[in-house]
A protein has these predicted regions:
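Conserved ABC ATPase signature
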Residues: 94-98, 102
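Helix-to-loop junction immediately C-terminal to a conserved catalytic motif
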Residues: 17
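Conserved ABC ATPase "signature" region
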Residues: 72-90
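Catalytic Walker B motif of ABC-type/P-loop ATPase nucleotide-binding domains
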Residues: 119-122
Length: 223
């Protein structure tokens, strides 16, 4: 999901996840309504991960406890996901002393441990350096390859191309275009989407507003 600031990307994710209820309409997942069962089949990672005042391993363990997993299962899952996310050597470290990039990897590991059907990622690399961004993207790819559907918001068009199978372009709370990734970036159909991809959205909007004002000035009814 891409779009400029204020497009409604984060709001859209929260509605899909069930954190917010729509004032009109409904959210449906694979034909079913957003019930408690569906919510429990989902996980979400925010731009700024929330860490418990516990060790790295305990942060993952706590999430698994809430899902009712046995102690034996929890230990096995924790070892596996921390290893896949490159955090096994840090499992006894307090989570809050990790670097921001390591905390984001831990947030992904915690979500992955739940084996969700769908994982929502709200700009997970927005504040990361290039090396940490690459590491997080590799984890995201691994989670997707393991069978989890991923819905991700990003301002990084390169990241959208690297990770996305399908692109949704939002602007001011409206879905203006939806297309397969290659098709979207090669030939966006919507004017705003095309301007956004070219990095010209601000100038396009200013030009449109100027043309509108000029038309209003020429309208004799406005004299």
């Amino acid at each position: 999901i891409i779009g400029p600031n204020g497009a409604g990307k984060s709001l859209f994710l929260r509605l899909c996840h069930g954190l917010l209820k729509p004032s009109v309409g409904s959210v449906r997942w694979l034909g079913a309504g957003t019930t408690n069962d569906l919510v429990s089949a989902q996980a979400m990672v925010f731009q700024r991960p929330v860490m418990l005042r516990r060790s790295v391993a305990a942060n993952v363990d706590y999430a698994l406890k809430l899902r009712g997993r046995t102690k034996t299962d929890r230990k096995e899952i924790i070892n596996e996901v921390l290893g896949r996310c490159g955090l096994r050597r840090l499992q006894e470290q307090p989570a809050r002393v990790l670097s921001y990039g390591e905390q984001q990897k831990l947030a992904l590991a915690r979500a992955w441990a739940l084996n969700p059907e769908v994982l929502f990622l709200d700009e997970p690399t927005a504040s990361l350096d290039p090396a940490s961004t690459h590491a997080v993207e590799e984890i995201v790819k691994a989670i997707r390859e393991a069978g989890t559907r991923i819905i991700l918001t990003t301002h990084d068009l390169g990241q959208a191309r690297r990770l996305g199978d399908e692109i949704l372009f939002l602007h001011r709370g409206r879905l203006l275009e939806r297309a397969e990734t290659d098709k979207f970036f090669e030939a966006p159909e919507n004017d705003l989407a095309r301007a956004f991809v070219r990095g010209e959205l601000l100038w396009w909007q200013l030009g449109r507003d100027n043309r509108r004002h000029e038309a209003q000035d020429k309208d004799p009814n406005n004299q």
